[in-house]
Amino acid sequence: MDEVSRSHTPQFLSSDHQHYHHQNAGRQKRGREEEGVEPNNIGEDLATFPSGEENIKKRRPRGRPAGSKNKPKAPIIVTRDSANAFRCHVMEITNACDVMESLAVFARRRQRGVCVLTGNGAVTNVTVRQPGGGVVSLHGRFEILSLSGSFLPPPAPPAASGLKVYLAGGQGQVIGGSVVGPLTASSPVVVMAASFGNASYERLPLEEEEETEREIDGNAARAIGTQTQKQLMQDATSFIGSPSNLINSVSLPGEAYWGTQRPSF
């Protein structure tokens, strides 16, 4: 091979190699253009792609936010009492006033029932009816040991109102009973009482309810008897007193037979 051919051969090979490299680069460029990625932005896309930790931080939290429905609610404060509410009273009855009359007037004017819980103080000139039926009039000054009773406004009958008192005399004697006359205070008398506005007067016993209760008791007794009869019919072994293999071949009557009169429930 001469020198001329030697000098041209590497140029020929190098030109083919350059042509192939240029063709391959063109294909890669077209492929990137079809995918919508420009060759100059490849490094930027890789640089801006979020890592795993950043992706977790940017992820939107799921579920209800803390404290969204757990806010403390304002307390409900009732500033107005109901008309039928149960109220407590501390009543002070001045000297020389009738304790029983004062309580009756309070119940009538306020249209509320009054339940006397206790009281203390001193009274004079007391008339009481003792448990034996006798009426005793006491003169002098007595200390109140116990005071109880109730007063209802009209239209309740007067028999629904009254006081019961137990007194201690100057010599230590204790006398008590239902007050049937004036109970005059000889010193300020303090009474603890409760009032209510929804009292209703009823006469007992209630005859209609008694009849209803009797009917309910009779229906319950009949239901118990029917249930017992069904249990006897279902349990044929206990009715006949024979083994179950013999009962299958025996025809039982439609109803249980009572040898004697059926007991009443």
From Swiss-Prot:
Keywords recorded for this protein, A-Z: DNA-binding, Flowering, Nucleus, Transcription, Transcription regulation
DNA-binding feature ranges: 59-71
InterPro entries: AHL15-29, PPC_dom
GO cellular component: nucleus
Domain PPC: 83-217
Location of region: Disordered: 1-75
Cellular compartment(s): Nucleus
Predominant cellular place of this UniProt entry's protein: nucleus
PROSITE patterns (alphabetical): PPC (PS51742)
Compositionally biased residues, Basic residues: 19-30
GO MF terms held by the record: minor groove of adenine-thymine-rich DNA binding
UniProt record, GO biological process: flower development; root development; vegetative to reproductive phase transition of meristem
Biological role stated in the UniProt entry: Transcription factor that specifically binds AT-rich DNA sequences related to the nuclear matrix attachment regions (MARs). Acts redundantly with AHL22, AHL27 and AHL29 in the regulation of flowering and regulation of the hypocotyl elongation.
Domain remarks: The PPC domain mediates interactions between AHL proteins.
Record's protein name: AT-hook motif nuclear-localized protein 18
Taxonomic source organism: Arabidopsis thaliana
